[in-house]
């Protein structure tokens, strides 16, 4: 992962990691920020929209644009492989898939990606060797577009890629043709390994069933990009077979502290019905919910709207980075470093899953010239935080810098080369603007003015 400018160093709240321009007695300046409860659109999180019934064959640019305009920054990209159960993926298919990712990027969006051989419910999928071959073919396209694929469901197996009802021996139990669980487990492990080998390390691979994750990773320690997707979140006592025991629920609550967890709701799948506002406001943070389908189940989502909690769910889902305070020396001498200490926290339900740095920019009030440095990794911030973490950015003031007053700007752009210069992919902090304090948001540059000034001599 490449970060913007400077060197990368995260500091604890008690540590100092800067060479000050006058360590003896340099006067300092600081400012505090005010949080907001506003629902702020941000990449890699939140309710996800629609991109068409098939991402390759029936892509709907208009649906993606509607999703963006509504404040969503993710769309579901469903890709049918039904025509290739017994064949390699043709070059034309791979080329069109690459073009679809480019179209999503142009729209300022990212995807939660799903490949499946069956979207009818029949479970007509492919053999583990065929799935592995297809993933090997997909690897270059996925790597080239990793910037817009933060999440990918494990997919491929069974009905709707949900890892049940397989006709190829990839599941056992209900609608699985009598396949033994020992055989199914071998097949599932082959597919798991193929996913881990061919999906970019920056993409969270969301597996359907906690029982698989418990089998593979008993202590909840796992590769950094293994996540979970619950296709019947809040459906009832078992979430339609998602959880076979209380221990599975406890495991997932622990597991999701460190990895991505998302899903979609279901229509009255079980009794007692368990999808009210108190349910989502309790289990959303318990399971560290990062993303959720905005189109299904509408009855559940409408219930939240009517009961008044939909906006809270929308704003709290995923990460939510809130600035608390900034402090730095009031003045710096050219040829030295200035340390800008930023206290911030993640008050969202989940962690950030793609690394990105905090960026500090000094902008000359007279000329508009800038100098920039970055530090830290916002994905390391714990979710639902009650206290601040300090990141200190050390910025070198070159001898060529013009003397004068410089505004301090804060930002968190995307870390990928293709999207890091695009403000639509930058994080907007969960802070209210305070124009009278000089704290304003610049949507063009995706920067927040800290309201402090550094004087350079």
Spans of model-derived segments:
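Extracellular/luminal regions of secreted and cell-surface proteins that mediate adhesion/ECM remodeling
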Residues: 314-457
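Aromatic-lined substrate-binding rim segments of carbohydrate-active enzymes
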Residues: 61-118, 128-131, 203
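An active-site-proximal structural segment forming one wall of the substrate-binding cleft
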Residues: 93-106, 126-153, 184-198
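Catalytic-core regions of glycoside hydrolase
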Residues: 151-158, 162, 166-297
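Catalytic cores of secreted or luminal carbohydrate-active enzymes
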Residues: 276-328
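Bacterial Sec-dependent N-terminal signal peptides
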Residues: 12-32
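Bacterial N-terminal signal peptides
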Residues: 2-15
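Boundary/entry segment of secreted carbohydrate-active catalytic domains
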Residues: 28-73, 78-80
């Amino acid at each position: 992962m490449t970060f913007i400018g400077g060197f990368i160093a995260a500091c604890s709240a008690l540590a100092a990691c800067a060479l000050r321009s006058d360590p003896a007695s340099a006067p300092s300046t600081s400012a505090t920020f005010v949080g907001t409860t506003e629902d702020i659109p941000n990449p890699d999180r939140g309710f996800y929209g629609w991109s068409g019934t098939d991402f390759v064959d029936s892509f709907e640019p208009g649906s993606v644009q509607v999703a963006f305009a509504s404040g969503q920054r993710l769309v579901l990209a469903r890709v049918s492989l039904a025509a290739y159960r017994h064949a390699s993926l043709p070059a034309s298919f791979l080329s069109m898939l690459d073009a679809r990712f480019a179209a999503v990027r142009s729209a300022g969006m990212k995807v939660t990606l799903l490949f499946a051989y069956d979207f009818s419910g029949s479970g007509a999928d492919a053999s583990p060797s065929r799935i592995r071959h297809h993933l090997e073919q997909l690897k270059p396209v996925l790597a080239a577009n990793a910037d817009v694929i933060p999440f990918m469901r494990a997919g491929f197996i069974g009905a709707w890629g949900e890892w049940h009802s397989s006709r190829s021996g990839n599941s056992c139990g209900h609608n699985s043709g009598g396949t033994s669980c020992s055989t199914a487990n071998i097949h599932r492990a082959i597919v798991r390994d193929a996913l881990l080998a061919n999906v970019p390390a920056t993409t969270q691979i969301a597996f359907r069933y906690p029982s698989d994750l418990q089998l593979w990773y008993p202590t909840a320690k796992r590769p950094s990009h293994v996540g979970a997707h619950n296709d019947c979140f809040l459906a009832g006592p078992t979430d339609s077979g998602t959880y076979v025991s209380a221990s599975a629920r406890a495991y997932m609550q622990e597991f999701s502290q460190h990895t991505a967890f998302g899903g979609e709701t279901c229509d009255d799948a079980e009794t007692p019905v368990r999808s009210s506002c108190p349910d989502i406001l309790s289990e959303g943070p318990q399971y560290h919910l990062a993303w959720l389908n905005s189109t299904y189940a509408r009855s559940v989502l409408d219930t939240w709207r009517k009961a008044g909690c939909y906006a809270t769910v929308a704003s709290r889902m995923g990460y939510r980075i809130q600035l608390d305070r900034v402090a730095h020396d009031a003045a710096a001498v050219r040829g030295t470093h200035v340390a800008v200490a930023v206290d911030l926290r993640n008050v969202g339900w989940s962690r950030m899953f793609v690394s990105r740095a905090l960026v500090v920019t000094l902008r000359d009030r007279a000329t508009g010239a800038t100098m920039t440095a970055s530090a830290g990794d916002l994905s390391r911030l714990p979710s639902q935080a009650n206290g601040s973490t300090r990141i200190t950015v050390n910025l070198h003031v070159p001898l060529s810098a013009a003397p004068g007053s410089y505004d301090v700007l804060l930002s968190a752009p995307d870390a990928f080369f293709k999207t890091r210069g695009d403000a639509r992919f930058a994080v907007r902090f969960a802070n209210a603007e305070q124009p009278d304090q000089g704290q304003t948001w610049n949507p063009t540059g995706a920067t927040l003015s800290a309201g402090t000034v550094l004087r350079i001599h």
